């Protein structure tokens, strides 16, 4: 058995968003009337309530807006923009799912997704000169890690899906990664800084009973933490200032 993988906590954390999303067969009661019973069960943690922009769902959020729940007629999602520990996010997801299951009673979730989005900003970490092959594992960089490749990189994006080697072949890993230009609201693209986007999405392709949800999410989290550590080389790891366990 492989050792348990834990996320390294960084002072300059690159993780910008974590989302757990559950799909289920359409529930027509959700768009037909406001989910008052569900709100009653999650209001202590998510007191702010608003419809989604398309008016087809609802958003329940903390007052600081750093964590929120999105409910539509066929999806339930918990999103966190200040991730620090898996146990804390896992507990939040469990509480929301329990509230949803109590009110709506789904027999199964048709798709279960755990997604981590990370944005690496070497200049913000004080790294100069910028040499990506000294920061990101060459296996992740692909051809951009080849020696002798010169020029100012303008952009790169790669998208692939792999079947994970267990769970009966029903689990998938989607990786979206590449180079981006990071700009602040007042900046133009020309004055932005180079960044590297790493989006890890783990999901099921077969229905999952609610009682199997927690162990599957735990497994997805382990896969995500392991892959993240494989991608980050020592120089980048140090520059992001790892915190003591």
Residue ranges, per PLM feature:
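Aromatic/basic-lined ligand-recognition segments
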Residues: 1, 59, 111-189
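Conserved short hydrophobic interaction patches
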Residues: 41, 45, 92-103, 220-223, ...
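C-terminal structured interaction module
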Residues: 197-245
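N-terminal low-complexity, intrinsically disordered segments
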Residues: 1-73, 77-79, 206, 212-215, ...
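Beta-strand elements of well-folded, non-transmembrane domains
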Residues: 22-26, 82, 118-120, 164-166, ...
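Aromatic- and glycine-enriched beta-alpha-beta binding-site module
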Residues: 69-121
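Short glycine-rich, low-complexity/disordered patches
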Residues: 50-59, 102-120, 148-157, 226-245
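Amphipathic N-proximal alpha-helical interface segments
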Residues: 65-76, 182-202
């Amino acid at each position: 058995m492989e050792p348990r993988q834990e996320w390294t906590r960084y002072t300059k954390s690159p993780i910008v968003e974590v989302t757990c999303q559950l799909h289920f067969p359409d529930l027509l009661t959700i768009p037909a009337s406001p989910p008052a019973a569900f709100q009653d069960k999650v209001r202590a943690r998510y007191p702010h309530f608003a419809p989604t922009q398309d008016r087809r769902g609802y958003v329940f959020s903390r007052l600081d807006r750093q964590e929120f729940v999105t409910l539509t007629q066929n999806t339930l999602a918990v999103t966190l923009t200040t991730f620090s520990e898996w146990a804390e996010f896992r507990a939040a997801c469990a509480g929301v799912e329990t509230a949803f299951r109590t009110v709506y009673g789904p027999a199964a979730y048709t798709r279960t997704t755990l997604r981590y989005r990370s944005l690496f900003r070497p200049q913000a970490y004080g790294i100069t000169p910028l040499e990506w092959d000294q920061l990101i594992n060459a296996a992740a960089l692909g051809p951009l890690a080849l020696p002798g490749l010169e020029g100012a990189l303008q952009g790169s994006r790669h998208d692939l899906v792999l079947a994970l080697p267990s769970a009966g072949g029903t689990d998938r890993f989607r990786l979206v990664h590449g180079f981006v230009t990071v700009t602040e609201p007042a900046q133009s693209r020309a004055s932005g800084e180079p960044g590297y986007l790493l989006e890890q999405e783990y999901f099921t392709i077969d229905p999952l009973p609610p009682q199997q949800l927690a162990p599957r999410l735990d497994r997805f989290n382990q896969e995500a933490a392991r892959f993240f550590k494989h991608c980050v080389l020592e120089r980048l790891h140090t520059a992001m200032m790892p915190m003591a366990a």
